[in-house]
Regions:
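Bacterial Sec-exported substrate-binding components of ABC uptake systems
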Residues: 1-77, 178-182
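Soluble periplasmic/extracytoplasmic beta-strand elements of cell-envelope proteins
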Residues: 52, 62, 70, 92, ...
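Solvent-exposed, polar/charged alpha-helical surfaces in well-ordered, non-transmembrane soluble domains
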Residues: 51, 67, 79-83, 119-123, ...
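A short, structured surface patch at a secondary-structure boundary
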Residues: 68-124, 128-134
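Extracellular/periplasmic catalytic domains that process cell-envelope and extracellular macromolecules
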Residues: 45, 62-64, 122-123, 144-146
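Extracytoplasmic substrate-binding proteins
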Residues: 60, 138-182
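A short helix-to-beta-strand connector/capping loop
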Residues: 49, 104-105, 149
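Short, structurally constrained coil/turn elements
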Residues: 47, 85-87, 145-147
Length: 182
């Protein structure tokens, strides 16, 4: 699952880095919008639940319901991956980094950049929160878990080489391990 589009076309529109005398004064393109929408791997998916796992914080978690998901990370990659897995309609809120057109009408549950607003999260009645420590604070994640919301903390370290593995882990969390391989 991933973005379809032409990276080469996008880079031709950007100025060369050395053409700006003071990078802090640079204005203009700040959001690349020419990428095409993410296409799901299937029109309809059937998550295989429950999923039992140990999250990155060492908590044993059982995921029973993926009908109302909040996927929170600094890059917005969790929402993009869930969209690619066919679960876009299950996403009920977003961070400021989740800029996909299909999510723009969803409420933002972070403030001041990437600080989780616990009240905003709980007001959406999520059945599953997927988060990593690229946003926080940690106390906010603990409060969401203490409120009884199934919360899975993922490993925040990502590299270009780990993309496939990261998507596979996320697919495993939501009961779609086979779809995550596509």
């Amino acid at each position: 699952c991933g973005v379809q589009g032409g990276y080469e076309d996008l880079t031709s529109e950007l100025p060369a880095a050395d053409s700006v005398s003071d990078p802090r004064s640079f204005t203009g393109l700040s959001n690349v919008s020419d990428f095409k929408d993410i296409e799901p791997v299937a029109d309809s998916v059937e998550p295989q639940l429950p999923v039992e796992l140990t999250d990155a914080d060492g908590n044993d978690v059982t995921v029973n319901d993926v009908s109302r998901i909040l996927a929170l990370d600094i890059y917005g990659t969790y929402t993009k991956s869930l969209t690619g897995l066919g679960l876009a309609d299950n996403i009920v809120g977003r961070t400021v980094s989740s800029t996909e057109p299909n999510l723009q009408d969803l409420p933002v549950v972070t403030e001041g950049g990437h600080n989780i607003n616990v009240e905003a999260v709980l007001s959406l009645e999520p059945t599953l929160v997927i988060v990593d420590h690229s946003i926080g604070p940690r106390d906010a994640i603990d409060q969401i878990r203490a409120a009884g919301v199934t919360t899975v903390v993922m490993e925040p370290q990502r590299t270009i080489d780990s993309v496939g593995e990261d998507i596979a882990k996320l697919g495993g969390v939501v009961g779609l391990p086979e779809e995550a391989k596509e």
